[in-house]
Amino acid sequence: MQNTIQSLLAVLVLAMSCFERLSGQSQPPLDTLDAQQKSIVSIAALTAKGDLTGLKKELNKGLDADLTIMKIKECLVHTYAYCGFPRSIRGIQSFMAVLEERKSKGIQDAMGVDASPVPQGGSKYERGKKILGELTKAPQDQPLAAYSVFAPAIDTFLKEHLFADIFERDVLSYAERELVTISVLSAIGNAEPMLRSHFAIC
C-alpha cells in the first residue's frame, strides 16, 4: 500500500499547479504536498482501488491533519464519478466506521461546512458547459465529436451531472476536485486519455 501511495504522490505532485491556476493560491514547491493534500490523494486512490484497510488508516490521517468530515465525505462522493458507486459507497461506509471508532475514543472531529445550495436556474447542460470551459480555459462551443457523437447520452451526463451537479458543490475547490479525480484515474489504471485530459486542465 505504501508503495502505491508513494508512486501516486510522485505523479500527482505534477498536478499541484492546479492550486495556482484553479484556486488562485500560490503554487507550492513541486516536491511537496501538504498533509491535507496528501490525505486527499491517498483517500481517493485507496477508495478507487477498494483497499478498505488502507483507506481506514488514511481516513484517520486525514482527520488528524484537520480535514473536516464534510470535506472527506465530499472527496468520497466525488470518487463515484470516476470509479463507480460501489467503490464510493464502500469508502463512505468505511468512513462511517472510522468516525464511530474515533467517537468511542472521545475524539471530536470538525464537521466543517456543507455545500451551499446549487443554482437552479437555466439549463443544467449549459451550466456544466460553462464550468468545463472555466476548467479547460477553452470555449465549449465546438460540435460534438468522437465518443460524444457515438453515445451522446454520455456527453449529456458529463455536462449535466459531473460538471453541473457535482462541480457546483462548493465543499471542495476545483483544484481539490482535480486532485481527487487524478488520484482515482491514476489508481484504476488504463485511463490514460482521461488522465492526460485532467493534467491538461492544470
Predicted features along the sequence, with ranges:
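Non-catalytic tandem-repeat scaffold regions and their flanking low-complexity/translocation tails
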Residues: 75-76
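Short conserved catalytic/interaction loops centered on acidic-Pro-aromatic/His motifs
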Residues: 192-199
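Bacterial Sec-dependent N-terminal signal peptides
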Residues: 1-27
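Acidic, glycine/proline-rich low-complexity segments that act as flexible tails and inter-domain linkers
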Residues: 22-37, 48-65, 70-71, 81, ...
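Amphipathic, charged-and-aliphatic alpha-helical interface segments
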Residues: 38-49, 178-191
